[in-house]
Amino acid sequence: MKKDLVFFLIDDDKDDIEIFDLALKQTDCLVKLVSANNGDDAIKKLQADDRFIPDYIFLDLDMPIMNGKICFEEIKKIKHLNKVPVYIYTTSQNPLDELKYLLSGATLFFFKPSYIKELVTFLRGIIDNTNH
């Protein structure tokens, strides 16, 4: 029996979290969404239980308390997460950001799409890739 995939979304925008959740539901796949509202909460959650290993992490860059840059660096220090793909999921259009994160080990730099259909297609691609 396959276990449900776990996606961990780190984003301070409640609307973006709802849209992400809705897009996941539209994939018609068994995926559990866990979220944190800022980098500090995310790191605490990830360090609190070394059995919590999401299948994928999606990280916004522009957040209060602990921004995505610092959060990304902290995630990379957590040994039990070293094989978890980290997707930078952001509105930042800075090509230097994209290059920096990809060179630092991010799996992909993905711009938050304007349409939910684009997000559904993107997420379905990740899920389909996981199941093969």
Each model region followed by its residue ranges:
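Conserved phosphotransfer cores of two-component systems
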Residues: 48-52, 76-83, 104
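Helix N-cap/capping motif at the beta->alpha junctions
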Residues: 35-44, 68-71
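Active-site residues of response regulator receiver
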Residues: 59-60
